[in-house]
């Protein structure tokens, strides 16, 4: 009786082995493998967003490499600031970054203030949506770029629309362009471990009586292909006397394929400075009992670092090593990976290089 039960499973194993052999013969070794055989299961590599609270809300300590990310929100909510800070963080790790400025509105002086090394930043200002996405595809396939930002999806105007008359109706053209581009891009993005961030704008659906009337431009393809979607909103103003010096900002993780979604982060964006990272370190550090707060005084390891939040923030800004030490302790206490301080001349290690070295080793063994 047992032999009869085992016979079908034995036949299935033989059929599977034959199918795998055929696939490897046709498409090459490693086209299909068991999860435990190769380096398929890897820890997700991330890059910080420049906001400690948002890194923690993302669940893995930052934005994932080898994935598509969408950041959307109303005008002047901090979308471009967030991506520029991410570029600065990637450059600190020794990565190469590119900014595809479809809106033709990048403020180079502001980018420099946020810590971006302009001499290492690739920038493109394409004429059409097709040109922008072709440039993105070429950069991703090269394997030499670690982070690409496209600002924004709404500005990716199809060539037919630019060449046509002002009143021409061309329904679905941009959506088809995005759908085709993302089908081509996703495979090479994962293979080369490149992080691609799309900035998007919000539009209103006409005639919606119930539910949220807001939607993003460029159709539904980006919603599906994005591993992380961030909704960024301005919730208030920061004032110094009567002068407005920044925005209070809320970011909601609307979609997250690598950690639980729907978490929120609240932080301040100061004009000309970006996210108040040191302020977040003090707030989250005192919540985690890593930074002691007694009255108006902030202390760390028994040593006073400032009276009042502004003084303590300036103290940490002047001592980035101490700020990084406190931040990493906060990250560990909240179960998020620490930030590395390594910077090399070469781009951050690629998945492809590890795969190539493994294939070379196997080839050597065969020879």
UniProtKB/Swiss-Prot annotation:
Coiled coil: none annotated. One of its GO terms (cellular component) is cytosol. This is Protein RecA. The keyword Protein transport does not apply. Residues 345-367 are annotated as: Disordered. Can catalyze the hydrolysis of ATP in the presence of single-stranded DNA, the ATP-dependent uptake of single-stranded DNA by duplex DNA, and the ATP-dependent hybridization of homologous single-stranded DNAs. It interacts with LexA causing its activation and leading to its autocatalytic cleavage. The keyword DNA-binding applies. The lineage of its organism: Bacteria, Pseudomonadati, Pseudomonadota, Betaproteobacteria, Burkholderiales. InterPro entries: AAA+_ATPase, DNA_recomb/repair_RecA, DNA_recomb/repair_RecA_CS, P-loop_NTPase, RecA-like_C, RecA-like_N, RecA_ATP-bd, RecA_C_sf. GO terms for molecular function: ATP binding; ATP hydrolysis activity; ATP-dependent DNA damage sensor activity; damaged DNA binding; single-stranded DNA binding. GO terms for biological process: DNA recombination; DNA repair; SOS response. It is found in: Cytoplasm. SMART domains: AAA. ATP binds at residues 73-80. Keywords: ATP-binding, Cytoplasm, DNA damage, DNA recombination, DNA repair, DNA-binding, Nucleotide-binding, SOS response. Belongs to the RecA family.
